[in-house]
Amino acid sequence: MTLSIYDDIFKQFPTIDEWSEPNEKIILEPFTYLGIITAKELPSMLIKAFNYWYQVPPPVLDLILKVVGPFHAATLLIDDIQDDSELRGGIPVAHKVYGVAQTINSANYVYFEAYQNISKLTPYLKSPETTDLWSMFNDEILALHRGQGLELYWRDTFTCPTEEEYLRMVHNKTGGMFRVAIKLMKALSPVQSLPDYFPLVNIIGILVQIRDDLLNLSPAFTKHKGYCEDLSEGKFGFPLIHSIKADSSNTLLMDILKLRPKDVPTKRKALKYMNDQTKSLDYTFDVICKLEKTAKDELKKLGGNPELSSIFELIHLSSTPDIEEKYKS
């Protein structure tokens, strides 16, 4: 390299502005590393299922999937950093391989790519002058971050929320991701006078999150995220909240959470207490059953949807997960 390139620096600007495919691949590596197939993630599955009603044309539906699918996958990268997770899908999380800085940049890049794709939906709007897709997107992404922010605050200040506070948090955090997809579909649907599907969407969001909290304590989840990872992360999952509130005079769980335990014996002790003393796993399962019935009743009132029924079958739990083997001494 010589100083000659600076003789007329203005000639260099077009070259500087160029962006190559190899560079694109480099900055997306933390995102692509986990091999998340967005079509198999629940938000994308729900989009396809709700399209049974909305009948959004395939080219438009593909664009919505390109907004929501990658955005959801990118949030998982950030979640793993905020939770200091070790595993996702049974392999080391992206930030343990590429570092926190590269992973944050990659996730943010995907966020803005998704946001950019919203502009491609505008030509398909029935009333572009009165429909603001960006506001729809922003409202729910703000809700998502509000929910996530509260959950992190509770964790970092060792503040155990009530069940009602937890439900409002999940309504924002998990529900926001689901609602943004359905709002986009509603705005772009050619069907007139559709029922209000958002109560069903909101129930699904809460059902899915409480189910995930319960499964986090089960053997089936261990290979994907590690054994009782919520305890290591200090997270107030639904079973934990119930157990702590069931006997506020017993500080065992709060003491264990403050340790952020990595060792199995300490986690077993917490799990045994939740299962045997406060029956919190059975309580959580009962709540899941009640929410599932509410969701199915709402689905029936809306006239039914075979694709959504298939998703309910997929996420159905027939009993409280068998965790006995995990805390046997």
From Swiss-Prot:
Binds 2 Mg(2+) ions per subunit. Its cofactor is Mg(2+). It catalyses: (2E)-geranyl diphosphate + H2O = linalool + diphosphate; (2E,6E)-farnesyl diphosphate + H2O = (6E)-nerolidol + diphosphate. One of its GO terms (biological process) is isoprenoid biosynthetic process. Terpene synthase that shows monoterpene synthase activity and produces linalool, using geranyl diphosphate (GPP) as substrate. Also shows sesquiterpene synthase activity as it is able to convert farnesyl diphosphate (FPP) into (E)-nerolidol. This is IDS-like terpene synthase 1. Mg(2+) 1 binds at residues 79, 83. One of its GO terms (molecular function) is metal ion binding. The gene is ILTPS1. InterPro entries: Isoprenoid_synthase_dom_sf, Polyprenyl_synt. IDS-like terpene synthases originate from a geranylgeranyl diphosphate synthase (GGDPS) progenitor in fungi, after the split of Melampsora from other genera within the class of pucciniomycetes. They lack coupling activity and act as classical terpene synthases. Mg(2+) 2 binds at residues 79, 83. The keyword Iron does not apply. Its EC number is 4.2.3.-. Keywords: Lyase, Magnesium, Metal-binding. Pfam families: polyprenyl_synt (PF00348). Belongs to the FPP/GGPP synthase family. It is an enzyme of class 4 (lyase).
